[in-house]
């Protein structure tokens, strides 16, 4: 059920994990129902709460939406999120959920193929630049019901192509690790990446999330689409929002976008 970017079916299986030579660390890791090899790339165990939320939202969609589903892990790393989707979110009829797993680093492909080889759902693995994959999917008329974009830094440049590739009523899970700009510590950076300026504030984390929602909303409205916030949270290092894209704006939706002021005297 696994096809890599080269078109070859994966066959390594879990047995490959047992072939690691003694004395060579294989970075083996367990989380939820997943057991996998992390490889040599960047990985944050502390981000588990966001992966838990991703699994819960995917599972809810699989239970409540009829027909075929297509989920995209756009910057997959070692594939732990996709693996947990396949093991924990897909409860019945795994053939109705197609997993697209992408990482821009081609050196990640062997790790991804090995980690995802035993999933019962059809899996498509690639190592393309995110914007290239999204553009190709849009041109081919392939739309996704769920997209998880766990970006490094500010993801603003990818929001428009992500929304264009998202199916109506589909969910976008968006993460940003740019904590300076939206919390008022880099005003010029905030104007560049968010189209708004932020100030240092006692509620900086909340304002950062609101900036991110505002950016998403403006990009969706440019397409004539509506946006429904579902979930927002931050631990101060990463800012995560989950939204559902609607076919059209709801009455009064644009009135939710505004400015926040704070009196420094009192």
Where would I find each of the regions flagged by the language model?
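SAM-dependent transferase fold signal centered on methyltransferase-like domains
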Residues: 1-266
